[in-house]
Amino acid sequence: LLGLIEGVNIRNSNMLVASDFLFISLVVFNLFGNCEKYLYGYGKYELLRYKKRTLILGKIILKSFLSVCVFCLTRIIIYAFLLFIRNEKIIDFTVADISNYIFTSILSLFFISILQTLVELKFSSFAGVITAFSYYIVSTILGGYFIEKEQYFPLLFLTTNFSMKNRTDLISADFVDLYILYLI
């Protein structure tokens, strides 16, 4: 379990943090304004047709989860393609490592998207985006601090280090570092 929560020392991997931030910004901006169309648009008419509010919220959460899954699978395909170009073995990890990476990556991005959705429901879309980005930045900085101090328990509450754990071996090569910022 300690190998799962160790995370990545972000001070040595600036390209990893930049590529992960670009990917999270894709997810956040894809979900931008997702709740406003239900609050101020045709959501009023669905409520008038005797649809439940929980059903509408379920639609919003399902759309959020599906978009996170699509973006995560797209990222995995891009990484596999870059490794194929370099003629490296794609399956250097065990199946448990790969499934652990996929599961934690989807969960961390889903948490950020749910955080954005809840803030959008209460305040505005801009407040949701600012909250999601600030949570990601604070979580990444605190994750690096806790790794330096070798305090692994607080990392359980910081989701971004979960998603970056198993990717360091995949994108640490020089060839991939040049293109990772533009592709992901």
Regions found by a protein language model. Give the residues of each.
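Interfacial "coupling" helices/loops that link adjacent transmembrane helices in transporter permeases
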Residues: 42-60
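Transmembrane helix boundary and interhelical loop/hinge segments in multi-pass membrane proteins
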Residues: 13, 30-48
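Transmembrane alpha-helices and adjacent helix-loop boundaries
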Residues: 37-42, 72, 122, 126, ...
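Terminal transmembrane helical anchor/hairpin motif
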Residues: 1-15, 131-184
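Hydrophobic alpha-helical transmembrane segments
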Residues: 99-103, 129-130, 179-180
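Secretory targeting signals
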Residues: 1-26, 32-34, 58-125, 164-174
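Membrane-helix interface segments
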Residues: 52-54, 124-129
